[in-house]
Amino acid sequence: MIINNQNSPQSINTPSSVSSRQHINKSKKKKENVIKRMLIRLSNSNNRSLATVFGVIGGLVLGIVLVCKEYENFPLVGKGLPLVYRIVGIFLSAGTGGNLSSYIGGTIDIITGDKTVVDLYKSFKRYFKKVKDKNHRSPIPLTNLNNNNNNNNNNNNNNNNNNNNNNNNNNNNNNNNNNNSGGSGSTDNNNNNNEPIFSNNNSNNNNDNNSDLEIPIPI
């Protein structure tokens, strides 16, 4: 185990060593701050600027790959061309990629209303969260649905039975009304039948009166 004495020359912090450490720390912080600022600016920038940056980087990488492979159909990169033309071809590739990406990013800005990438990411995240919540909601059990359907069917059957009972009651009332009308007809018949009875009584009375008359017998 090594113990550093305070009086040893290694443990003594000279002003030059302290300043050099501070300078290194400051330079690291500056680099981190620069990268952080660039990322923040890119995230807060519109889609056209962001797409242009990535398009230029992508076109540059594509141009370098095509030059290294000596792709003949790519302009200013074919075999036998000097190195200057190839470098120009790489820059043309980067510019073409940047222009195309700029058009695409501008179209996205028009559609989304100049929303940044962060805003688009948050909106997509909220949308997928809503969809996930809807899918994870507990569905209604099938037994409850079947019970509800059976109850509805029973209610319908009861309503039909009540309607049938009402119809039967109406029919019974109609039959009673018909019976009452038939009874009035029978009384008329009885009255009609009684009429000859009165006539018979009259004839009987006449016969009785005739029997009381004295008929003279001739001698």
Swiss-Prot record:
The chain crosses the membrane at residues 49-69, 83-105. Residues 1-17, 144-212 have a biased composition (Low complexity). It is a multi-pass membrane protein. This is Putative uncharacterized protein DDB_G0285135. The keyword Transmembrane applies. GO terms for cellular component: membrane. The keyword Transmembrane applies. Residues 1-31, 135-219 are annotated as: Disordered.
